[in-house]
A protein has these predicted regions:
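Histidine- and acidic-residue-rich, metal-dependent catalytic cores
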Residues: 1-204
Length: 205
C-alpha cells in the first residue's frame, strides 16, 4: 500500500473474506490468525449483502437474515444446539465469529427499537390528522344540514381553517380514508417489529 497513513486499516480490507474454519481467502487463515477487525468486517459484510439482496425497507422479517448467518457461525459437523453465548470460542469453528454475531444481534434489536419509535411518531401524526379530518367531516355534515346560509358559511369557514396544505373540499374525505388505512398498517407493523425482537432474542446456534 503506497499511502502509509492507510496501512493501519489495510488488514480489515485484506482479510475480511477469511473464515474461522480456514475456508476463506486469500490465505485460508483460521481463528486467531485472522485480525479481529477483519472478523468484524466479515460479519458486517455478510449481513449487508443479505439485507441488500432482500431489499428490506423495514426490520420486519429481519430475523430470517440472522437465521441464515447463524448457519455460518456453526461448525458443519456440529449438530448440538446451544445458546449463542454458551458456545466456546475454542470449539471447532464455523465461518464467522458467534461472539461478533451476537453483537450484531444486539445492534439489530436496537435498530428495530428505533424503527418502532419512528413508526409510533408517525402513528401519533396519523391519529391527530384523522381526528382533525373527522372534525372537518362533521362540519361538512352540519353545513349540509343547515337551513340558514349564515350557518352554512360558518361551518364552511371552519372547514377551511382546518384544512392543511393540499387538502380541500373535494379530496379531504379520500385523504381521511387513506390515513385510516395507513394507521391500520402501521399499528400492525408495530406488533410485527416487537415480534421480531422476541424471535431474535430466542435465536440459538
Amino acid at each position: 500500500m503506497k499511502d502509509l497513513r492507510l496501512r493501519p486499516y489495510a488488514e480489515g480490507a485484506l482479510y475480511h473474506h477469511e473464515a474461522l474454519n480456514g475456508t476463506g481467502y486469500p490465505q485460508g487463515l483460521k481463528k486467531e490468525d485472522i485480525p479481529f477487525v477483519a472478523r468484524i468486517i466479515r460479519v458486517a459484510d455478510e449481513y449487508d449483502a443479505l439485507v441488500t439482496k432482500r431489499h428490506y425497507k423495514t426490520h420486519v422479517n429481519i430475523s430470517e437474515t440472522l437465521k441464515l448467518m447463524l448457519k455460518d457461525a456453526k461448525p458443519d459437523d456440529m449438530h448440538k444446539v446451544v445458546a449463542l453465548d454458551q458456545l466456546s470460542e475454542n470449539a471447532q469453528s464455523g465461518k464467522i465469529s458467534p461472539k461478533i454475531l451476537k453483537c450484531l444481534f444486539k445492534i439489530v434489536i436496537e435498530d428495530t427499537k428505533y424503527e418502532i419509535s419512528c413508526v409510533i411518531d408517525y402513528i401519533d401524526y396519523l391519529k391527530e390528522s384523522i381526528k382533525r379530518l373527522e372534525l372537518i367531516d362533521s362540519y361538512n355534515m352540519k353545513m349540509q344540514n343547515a337551513t340558514k346560509q349564515k350557518k352554512r358559511d360558518y361551518y364552511k369557514e371552519g372547514m377551511v381553517m382546518l384544512f392543511q396544505a393540499g387538502e380541500n373540499f373535494q379530496n379531504y374525505h379520500q385523504i381521511l380514508k387513506e390515513y385510516r388505512a395507513a394507521l391500520v398498517i402501521r399499528e400492525k407493523r408495530i406488533d410485527d417489529l416487537y415480534n421480531e425482537i422476541k424471535i431474535i432474542k430466542k435465536l440459538k446456534v
